[in-house]
């Protein structure tokens, strides 16, 4: 992970938890297969034992790469301070450290997504078995994923965006690559990313087993707080909004450090189902301004109730938050050189260099992706005060 607020170590208790998690996951793996694909009682024993062996042979190490982050172009002022000209991104994310996130957010995440997070070794057997049985017996499809499992899935999706396209291009011959047009190159990359995404998120037993195995590996290598921080920085909050800092900026015009209890619970409600719970569709009939964002409010209140039950908030804090209406204050993020006003031409000039100079990538596609995902911080020589005076 990019943020290094924590050492990549586990406490003895955490290591023991990881080992227990491996045993628990093996049992859960057998349960998943038994309820999912083995209806005949006579074959249950064989299926269960075979699944445990297969599970324990799955890879248990997950390489965590850099997160996709927006790139910014800055100008300067006469006093030496900087001013943002424009931002560019595929994912609107601002990665932050542990101390930059309000404790309400951390507690709301655990309460809403994984109440036994600090007790298990990466897999919540109770939640996993409940979800598997409910889904297999025809009930509403349920997730049952721990925070570590959700983090793993998000990391795998990020890998798809970062690596699937380049790997697909590498499989082509030199002549095939030379013959590519920008449109065909883009189509190949997009197809590879979508196929990788489908594999990383498909509702399938083998995918779930791999996710569980990797979650245990992550728990062995990182602390609980480190995993939670990684999750809060990588999670999707609807549309192109990723990570708790960008979500706080976008939905409530504040920072992750300054969120209120009600706001924190409202934001963490979104990650459960961004399409259903996001707060930027005021005209929605089910979750809009007219009904007080009813879907988000219901999920928020569930999280608040869980926080109260876990003694993470006082009764007074709970009462105040539960009585607070969900009222988003949307701040649209600036993107593209059109936001640079009179300096747009200079912004375009800088952007053109970043997308054409070979130092920023081997080809046009790579340079474009690096620019939109690489988190560039570009400080230019443009003096805004002199520029404004010249235009006056």
PLM region spans:
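Soluble periplasmic/extracytoplasmic beta-strand elements of cell-envelope proteins
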Residues: 70-76, 86-87, 95-97, 108-111, ...
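Solvent-exposed coil/turn segments that connect beta secondary-structure elements
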Residues: 76-79, 90-93, 101-104, 112-115, ...
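N-terminal periplasmic "start-of-domain" segments of outer-membrane beta-barrel proteins
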Residues: 79-93, 127-134, 366-368
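Non-catalytic, structured segments within soluble enzyme domains
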Residues: 144-391
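Alpha-helical membrane-targeting segments
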Residues: 45-58, 121-140, 166, 198, ...
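N-terminal type II signal-anchor transmembrane helix
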Residues: 2-76, 83
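Flexible, acidic/glycine-enriched loop-and-adjacent beta/alpha segments
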Residues: 97-150, 242-252, 259
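N-terminal post-signal-peptidase region of extra-cytosolic proteins
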Residues: 53-60, 89-98, 112, 212
């Amino acid at each position: 992970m990019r943020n290094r607020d924590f050492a990549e170590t586990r406490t003895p208790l955490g290591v023991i938890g990881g080992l227990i998690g491996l045993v628990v996951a093996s049992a859960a793996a057998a349960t998943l297969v038994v309820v999912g694909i083995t209806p005949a009682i006579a074959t249950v024993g064989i299926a269960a034992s075979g699944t445990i062996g297969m599970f324990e042979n799955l890879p248990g190490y997950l390489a965590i790469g850099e997160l996709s982050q927006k790139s910014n172009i800055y100008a300067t002022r006469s006093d030496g301070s900087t001013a943002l000209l424009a931002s560019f991104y595929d994912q609107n994310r601002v990665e932050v450290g542990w101390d930059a996130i309000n404790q309400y957010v951390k507690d709301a995440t655990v309460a809403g997504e994984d109440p036994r997070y600090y007790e298990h070794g990466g897999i919540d057997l109770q939640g996993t078995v409940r979800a598997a049985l409910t889904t297999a017996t025809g009930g509403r499809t349920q997730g049952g994923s721990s925070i570590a499992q959700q983090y793993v899935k998000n990391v795998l999706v990020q890998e798809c965006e970062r690596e699937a396209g380049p790997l697909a291009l590498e499989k082509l011959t030199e002549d095939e690559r030379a013959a590519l047009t920008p449109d065909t190159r883009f189509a190949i990359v997009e197809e590879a990313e979508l196929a990788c995404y489908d594999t990383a998120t498909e509702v399938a037993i083998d995918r779930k087993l791999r996710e569980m195995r990797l979650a245990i590996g992550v728990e062995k290598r990182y602390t609980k707080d480190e995993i939670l921080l990684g999750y809060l920085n990588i999670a999707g909050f609807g549309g192109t909004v990723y990570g708790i800092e960008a979500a706080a900026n976008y939905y409530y015009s504040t920072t992750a450090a300054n969120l209120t209890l009600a706001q924190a619970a409202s934001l963490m409600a979104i990650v459960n189902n961004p399409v259903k719970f996001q707060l930027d569709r005021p005209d929605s009939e089910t979750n809009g301004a007219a009904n007080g964002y009813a879907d988000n409010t219901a999920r928020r209140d569930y999280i608040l109730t869980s926080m109260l039950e876990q003694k993470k908030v006082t009764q007074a804090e709970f009462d105040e938050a539960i009585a607070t209406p969900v009222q988003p204050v949307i701040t649209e993020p600036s993107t593209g050189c059109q936001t640079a006003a009179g300096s747009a031409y200079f912004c375009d000039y800088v952007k053109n260099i970043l997308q054409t100079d070979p130092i920023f990538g081997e080809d046009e596609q790579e340079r474009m992706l690096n620019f939109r995902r690489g988190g560039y911080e570009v400080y230019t020589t443009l003096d805004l005060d002199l520029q404004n005076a010249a235009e006056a």
